[in-house]
Amino acid sequence: TGYVVAMIGGRGTKEGNLTLNRSTDAVRQPGSTFKIVSTYAPALDSAGMTLADVEVDGPFNYDNGRPVSNWYSSGYRGICSLRDGIRDSLNIVTVKVLTQITPRLGYEYLQKFGFTTLVDGVEKNGKIFSDVQQALALGGITYGVKNIELNASYATIANGGQYIRPKLYTIVKDHDGNVILDNTSTEGTQVIKPSTAFLLTSAMQDVVTSGTGTAVNFGGMSIAGKTGTTSDYNDIWFSGYTPYYTCTTWTGYDNNTKLRKGEERSLAKKLWKAVMSQVHEGLENKSFSQPADIVAQTVCAQSGKLPTALCGETLKTEYFAADTVPTETCDVHYQGSVCAYSGLPAADACPFATEGTLEMLPENERILTGQVTSEDSQRVCEHSSVFMATPGADQIIEQERLELQLRSNSAQYEALLVSLQQQLQTAVEDKAIADQA
């Protein structure tokens, strides 16, 4: 409805008038809570992407050359779906998605969601600042956001995609009872489709059940939400909702002191749980409603496409808007002629061709360095008829043949070594049993 049921603007007893209300006036960096509204909402709503689409969580730079880092600092997870990106708050996956759909589209959606503190080409101390850039995906913006506006954006998702401006009053009358201000209208603006809202809700339920927000659960109530933490721990958030209410909590210091490890860094989630568990007392647990145009479809988890017989144990069921259900079949799992040297599908003149199966995983270095034919953009080895006809190809093939033989010998040696170690271990165990007897 847009009605604000409760608001806390600071700690302790209010001791004055016109004091800082951190819920309506403070502007803070939103961290990963912004991933949902800046990136995944537009990606699913109008960019043709789905929760099953995959991106590679691997080394990636912003356009200015600065590397994008995940919040867990080191290592990469390889191929990940958009659902994984939401559940585990993956920075690299999210930036890649916004890069594809363009920061401009993300910025336009944020304006529809009701944010008033974003800028596009503002001058500050002789420099021009704009929030229309890749860091928008992670909440890296010029000024920040207001709690009440962030909460309203999540309430929009909870409301089936309809934005209603937050209401702090209903009706104002004069001393004669005449209505001066009427704020009871519940009309809103459709920002995202109901199907998009459901998909976001489904993914954010994973955040609460198995992702970064498990601490907010209470009483079996259906909850969807997203955590948010700035890189320097100045701001920590949780924004989420149930079928009844939406709530956003922020913790931090006015002077930007870093929140300390332990209790301070988990306070936003604990506060959210404490508040929401009270306002839901006496309310029945119920599920989020599912629009009629949502379809459940089995896909290959490594391609996000319809599975083939080769996909094996990588199958999963995902929700789709009816008009985005995959029609293409998996192109990750391959069976056919394989180049024994490169591990890629064999080109037309490959001297190392053999029958086999393989996974065309994007994070695999040998796949990334493979050539692409102009005919069908299929990654194949370099041994095409054109390559084989080039001067010096014979010498290259001979070198590769020797390297392949060395690999084979090395593999045989390692297998022999493992066998000898197993025999030795068995002999030691047999001797120990004999000694005990």
Please place each PLM-identified region on the residue numbering.
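A penicillin-recognizing enzyme superfamily signal
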Residues: 1-8, 13-26, 143-342
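Active-site SXXK
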Residues: 2, 29-55, 85, 153-157, ...
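Short active-site loop at a secondary-structure junction
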Residues: 15-37, 51-54, 135, 139
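Sec-exported extracytoplasmic/periplasmic mature domains
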Residues: 39-48, 56, 60, 87-91, ...
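Conserved catalytic neighborhood of penicillin-recognizing serine enzymes
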Residues: 48-106, 133, 175-206
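Mid-domain, small-residue-enriched loop/turn segments at the edges of structured enzyme/sensor domains
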Residues: 66-71, 102-150
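Low-complexity, Gly/Ser/Thr/Pro-rich intrinsically disordered linker/tail segments
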Residues: 297-417
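Extended amphipathic alpha-helical heptad-repeat regions
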Residues: 410-437
